[in-house]
């Protein structure tokens, strides 16, 4: 099966992007200056990522709110139209996190549900199952991923540089969602991101994506790829599906119980998750820091007193801190300051538990 292409694929290739497969898409890993330079540009300036591989399921209709309440872990009553919310879709049987999702509540009866790259069909299927289980309920849930590009502008200078392109886009506050217009194109802009920095994500029609990209980069915003996005999200302590979330991993194990609201009523997987809450988790996600430039790596064993007690889910060298950082599943009694060892290809790295984020 051929990987899908971003509406900006030709633009990326024309400026020297290194293209890699990711979640069924061909996407830029980095550009000519490389991942390290792009990472630093985001921490100290502003970058733009093409994140068009994020799915968009547009859910509309008078029953849309009720269906999403039954589908996802968080409580939409806590926000309102014009706001965004982080949430999870769980497996019905074991409460594993099928996907972690941002919902943009665009209008009173319009929601853009934003799954990860490869999970759009699973999310759509789950919504269909929930509609079938609810009497007299109808919604319209359409995959509009291919109709638009999504550009994430992130960094401490993101808003100041964005304001030279469009002041309205630059003014969308954190976790706000607004419909805007740019050069005749209808946009949806949200104050969301995945870097630990301030910024916005812009959904733009595919027909106008290249023009908006050019306007942003001409304003001094640096193109950045998936490599920098991963090191940035790790420094920020943010989970990545397939690493810190996925099959066999629950919201509670991942330390994301704040995105779960048991008091709102039943949701998909709520019984299984409540049972885990009541009996106690068997492991928990924690941050680890190491000395030196050698980074911990995904899959590395974590040892305490010579005994394997956990596993690294994501690890890398932190450009900002100058040493290794990792997220790992550890015993539930692990506390900040506890000492462990990480086995990296036969070499043991001393590691200390910290509370993420590592930076910021």
PLM regions and their residue ranges:
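Acidic, proline/glycine-enriched N-terminal capping motif
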Residues: 1-89, 96, 227
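Acidic active-site catalytic centers that drive phospho-/nucleotidyl reactions
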Residues: 50, 100, 201
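Short, charge-rich binding segments
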Residues: 70, 78-80, 89-96, 101-107, ...
């Amino acid at each position: 099966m051929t990987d899908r292409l971003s509406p900006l694929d030709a633009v990326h290739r024309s400026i020297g992007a290194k293209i890699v497969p990711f979640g069924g898409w061909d996407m830029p890993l980095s550009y000519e200056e490389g991942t390290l330079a792009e990472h630093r540009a985001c921490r100290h300036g502003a970058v733009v990522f093409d994140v068009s591989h994020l799915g968009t399921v547009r859910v509309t209709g008078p029953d849309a709110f009720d269906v999403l309440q039954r589908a996802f872990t968080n409580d939409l009553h806590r926000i309102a139209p014009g706001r965004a919310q982080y949430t999870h879709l769980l497996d019905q049987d074991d409460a594993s996190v099928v996907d972690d999702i941002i919902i943009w509540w665009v209008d009173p009866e319009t929601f853009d549900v934003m799954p990860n790259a490869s999970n759009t069909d699973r999310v759509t299927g789950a919504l269909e199952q929930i509609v079938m289980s609810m009497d007299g309920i109808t919604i319209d849930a359409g995959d509009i991923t291919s109709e638009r590009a999504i550009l994430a502008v992130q960094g401490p200078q993101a808003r100041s540089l964005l304001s030279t392109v469009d002041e309205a886009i630059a003014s969308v506050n954190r976790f706000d969602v607004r419909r805007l217009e740019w050069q005749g194109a209808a946009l949806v802009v949200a104050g969301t991101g995945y870097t630990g920095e301030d910024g916005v994500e812009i959904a733009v029609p595919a027909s106008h994506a290249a023009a908006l990209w050019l306007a942003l980069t001409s304003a001094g915003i640096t193109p950045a790829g998936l490599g920098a996005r991963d090191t940035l999200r790790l420094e920020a302590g943010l989970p990545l599906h397939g690493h810190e979330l996925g099959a066999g991993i629950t919201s509670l194990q991942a330390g994301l119980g704040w995105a779960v609201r048991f008091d709102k009523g039943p949701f998909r997987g709520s019984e299984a998750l409540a049972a885990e809450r009541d009996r106690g988790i068997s492991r928990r996600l924690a941050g680890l820091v190491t000395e030196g430039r050698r980074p911990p790596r995904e899959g590395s064993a974590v040892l305490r007193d010579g005994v394997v007690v956990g596993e690294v889910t994501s690890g890398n060298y932190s450009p900002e801190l100058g040493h290794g950082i990792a997220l790992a599943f550890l015993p539930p009694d692990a506390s900040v300051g506890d000492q462990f060892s990480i086995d990296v290809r036969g070499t043991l790295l001393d590691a200390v538990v910290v509370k993420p984020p590592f930076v910021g």
